[in-house]
């Protein structure tokens, strides 16, 4: 489902975000992407979402070569992706329900269908009772769970969660991770990046480690 073949990302003559990375992530797999800040985790995630293109090598997602995909094809690729970032980027002038409905509305879904699916997504993360609340009325952990609901409302094949538990207390972090693991259990491919050792210590899935843009331990 996700394949990197000798992928490098070079920003200047001697500045590499990724260097000769090769890995495979199978359909339905849960993978933790570990490493300190600046290790290249976010760059790897951005390549899967076609936000970044490789300087060399090949990135393939669902059979599509990210380096060759045309700009017009990127929205179609992303319809199969659920993207979750450390900073939720919720719209403060919309309710929680409105935020979760938005990905469906922008693709032309009828409002009634979008609302029904958004309510179902909020129910899955335990926030249906806060549907009418505004983002600033929620805690950081609750806002991150809204971001999870928004990411899964379009029923993606792949969830990319970039540091989803950063700056959360342990209880809030655990609830976010529990939600992501539940989606994985339902068959969704999940890639979760983190530098939190507590998250990794409790991980029962494969861990891919990056340091200075390179895989630790070789190809995976």
List PLM regions with ranges:
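ABC ATPase NBD coupling module
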Residues: 12, 66-82, 111, 185
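Helix-to-loop junction immediately C-terminal to a conserved catalytic motif
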Residues: 49
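Conserved ABC transporter NBD signature motif
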Residues: 57-65
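Conserved ABC ATPase signature
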Residues: 134-138, 142-144
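A short, proline-enriched helix->beta-strand linker immediately N-terminal to the Walker B motif
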Residues: 153-157
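Catalytic Walker B motif of ABC-type/P-loop ATPase nucleotide-binding domains
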Residues: 159-162
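Helix N-cap at the start of a conserved alpha-helix in ABC-type nucleotide-binding domains
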Residues: 170-172
């Amino acid at each position: 489902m996700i394949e990197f073949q000798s992928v490098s990302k070079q920003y200047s003559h001697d500045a590499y975000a990724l260097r000769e990375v090769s890995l495979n992530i199978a359909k339905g797999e849960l993978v933790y992407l570990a490493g300190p800040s600046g290790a290249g985790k976010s760059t790897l995630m951005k390549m899967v979402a076609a936000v970044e293109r490789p300087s060399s090598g090949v990135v393939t997602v669902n059979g599509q070569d990210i380096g060759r995909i045309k700009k017009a094809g990127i929205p179609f690729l992303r319809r199969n992706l659920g993207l979750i970032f450390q900073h939720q980027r919720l719209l403060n002038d919309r309710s929680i329900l409105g935020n979760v409905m938005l990905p469906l509305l922008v693709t032309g879904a009828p409002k009634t269908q979008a609302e029904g699916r958004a309510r179902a997504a909020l129910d899955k993360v335990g926030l249906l009772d806060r549907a009418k609340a505004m983002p600033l009325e929620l805690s950081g952990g609750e806002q991150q769970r809204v971001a999870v609901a928004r990411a899964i409302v379009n029923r993606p094949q792949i969830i990319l969660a970039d540091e989803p538990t950063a700056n959360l207390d342990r209880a809030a972090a655990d609830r976010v991770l529990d939600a992501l693991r539940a989606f994985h259990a339902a068959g969704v491919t999940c890639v979760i990046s983190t530098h939190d050792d507590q998250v990794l210590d409790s991980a029962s899935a494969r861990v891919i480690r990056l340091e200075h843009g390179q895989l630790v331990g070789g190809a995976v």
